[in-house]
Amino acid sequence: MITSKQNDTNALTYLLSQDIVLKNAMKNNDGSIIDYSNVIDGLQTKSLFKNIWIQVIDKDGISLYRSWTKKHGDKISKVRLDIQEVLKSQKELLSISTGKFDMTFKTIVPIFEDKKFLGVVEMITHFNSIAKKLKSKNIDPVFLVDKSYKEKIIHPLTKLFIDNYYVANKNAS
């Protein structure tokens, strides 16, 4: 299930990397023309993806767009080693990581136009759809993040902790 989720997230992120509006935004350094709310709403309605976050980062490591907050314009590459790696290598990266908000699946795909590197698009998905699939098979999963990450998770998506272990799936019982 994890590999399937990563592959699906990667495929969706690749599709976004081909978006002409996205490429124009990056060429003109104008994140205001990017809006993926309809895409996210459609995926929530028509797929198991219920909580998708999208971030667009220019070639200099500056966030032009985030779907889950209005914050943008910061040099995200200063604090995200994975972003630094992709900006340098210009190759896609798939990972599972724990950050400020949650334990997530992250896919970062480089964006090119006429072989010119413009930046990256990142899709972040969560463990809830996997938990839902397991529940449908009468398995009650609890995805825990080690308590050593408690101070790092400053805006927890689920807001649920058990003995300082963060619970990453909303439907944990």
Tell what function each PLM region has.
Residues 68-69, 97, 122:
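Short clusters of small/polar residues that mark proteolytic maturation junctions
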Residues 101-110:
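A short beta-strand signature within small-molecule sensing/ligand-binding domains used
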Residues 169-173:
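A conserved mid-domain beta-alpha-beta active-site/ligand-binding segment of alpha/beta enzyme cores
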